[in-house]
Design a protein with these regions (language model features):
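Short, low-complexity, polar/charged sequence segments that are solvent-exposed and flexible
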Residues: 22-25, 71-74, 93-96, 119-122
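Hydrophobic/aromatic beta-strand patches that form the interior of the parallel beta-sheet core
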Residues: 4, 73-75, 101-103
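Active-site ExK catalytic segment of metal-dependent nucleases
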Residues: 70-82
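Catalytic cores of nucleic-acid endonucleases
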Residues: 79-121
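Accessory nucleic acid-recognition modules appended to NTPase machines
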Residues: 1-69
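Conserved N-terminal glycine/acidic-rich loop preference
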Residues: 62, 68-72, 111-113, 118
Length: 122
């Protein structure tokens, strides 16, 4: 299972890191970044009544799978500039989602994603 906080404040406090320390630790920053996007997705899911899952098979994974009325959308969060993952490619072959989205530097910019009405993805 994958644990997702509803608010990054808890994650931030428990890490004991300053902002500067977190930003310079690429692994930790990736966790904060993914968690912030996830918290937004969970909040939108509650308000707009869609389901959120995490998918993993072997080494392949998709960070967030959104489902509403039998339509699915796959979302991968990348803080390091990547845009393609084997997990997303495999998920697409297996489940043929309505959309596959990368949130990050070389995908949808985080600021834009965090202002989107996620219902429009379906």
């Amino acid at each position: 299972p994958k644990y997702q906080v509803y608010n990054n404040a808890l994650l931030s406090v428990l890490s004991g890191l300053s902002f500067k320390e977190a930003v310079t630790d690429s692994k930790r920053w990736g966790q904060f970044f993914e968690s912030a996007i996830g918290a937004y997705i969970i909040s939108e899911a509650f308000v707009h009544r869609f389901e959120v899952y995490y998918w993993r098979e072997g080494n392949d994974e998709v960070d967030f799978v959104l489902k509403k009325n039998q339509k699915i959308v796959a979302i991968e969060v990348k803080s390091n500039g990547e845009t393609k993952t084997t997990g997303m490619e495999r998920f697409h072959k297996l489940f043929n989602p309505l959309a596959t989205i990368v949130v990050g530097e070389n995908g949808i910019q985080p600021e834009l994603f965090l202002s989107m009405d996620l219902r429009k993805l379906f």
